[in-house]
Amino acid sequence: MYKVYLKSGKEESLKRFHPWVFSGAIAHFDGEPEEGEVVDIYTSKKEFIAKGHFQIGSIAVRILSFRQDEAIDADFWRRKLRIAYDMRRSIGIAENPTNNTYRLVHGEGDNLPGLVIDIYARTAVMQAHSAGMHLDRMAIAEALAEVMGDKIDNIYYKSETTLPFKADLYPENGFLKGGSADNIALEYGLKFHIDWLKGQKTGFFVDQRENRSLLERYAKGRSVLNMFCYTGGFSVYAMRGDAKLVHSVDSSAKAIDLTNQNVELNLPGDVRHAAYAEDAFKYLDRMGDQYDLIVLDPPAFAKHRDALRNALQGYRKLNVKAFEKIKPGGILFTFSCSQAVSKENFRTAVFTAAAMSGRSVRILHQLTQPADHPVSIYHPEGEYLKGLVLYVE
């Protein structure tokens, strides 16, 4: 196994169990590891400190273990996946009769940086965000099949768009096990078509489950606007919550089709719903003041720190329009899923938008990702989803 030696003092973050080694912290290599290989990491005093997947880039090593005697083998993957599953079962997410849609592995939050696994009924969708996880995909899939047993029939690998383009990895999406065409999953008693073949992320935004459920509590009798609706999750929950009407908007015609399918799947023939394929900002410009519950759940405006300024301007602009148009006594659910945007950045952008609109605004809830998207206490960067529920006078 190749060795990586750190510069003096650069081991401090690893002593605090942070799961990344940045390229600037490395003094030299003992040999020339290939991307995705497991390497041992040593301090400048030649003391072992951790091991992980090597990759060319800013994050040079993603830590898999802080134990020198722990091999990264089949037993390792089985053990880690079992721990992840047992945690979700113990908190009532896995093996829940009303919900078979959840995240089984959430990267650093489950001490498996670079790996995401979502469960949709009897299909697991696996996604690699690092070269190492891609190269280990078959071993991971075998361990996953053992741990889940008869709870899943299919494992679909979806990493064509998540791996670094400079790495010669040639990932191909496809089934590693099974191949079922059944793509309907259950979330708190509601059914959803999951497009893991061509949809965004793994096919569904699992991280908004609890926030969708919260919105259902506020929907009764309200006119609801769901912006950036994608699969229509918030729309379906609002309708079950007895909303007066629900309008879904997305720039993608395919997303609108999927939203309409999901509404029809749960509430066939319900005339309270209408969907529009239109740019969000244009729709907000032309709409009247008929809505008293608005959801703003845009795609990530900033995927990197260098895009932060423009992202914050985008959040301000979007929220100003919502504040200006929402009815008095209305409720605004507003989100950011950009990891580069901190909780403080996002709140400041929304507060600025409120002030610019001249409306009186109160915070009802401060939202984040659900328990199946855990954040390692040693990796605060993992808290990426920010949300506010606001009462607008």
What residue ranges belong to the model's regions?
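Mobile active-site "lid"/loop adjacent to the S-adenosyl-L-methionine
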Residues: 291-321
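Conserved class I S-adenosyl-L-methionine
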Residues: 221-230
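Non-catalytic substrate-recognition/targeting regions of SAM-dependent transferases
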Residues: 105-118, 134-205, 213
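Conserved SAM-binding loop of SAM-dependent methyltransferases across substrates and taxa
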Residues: 231-243
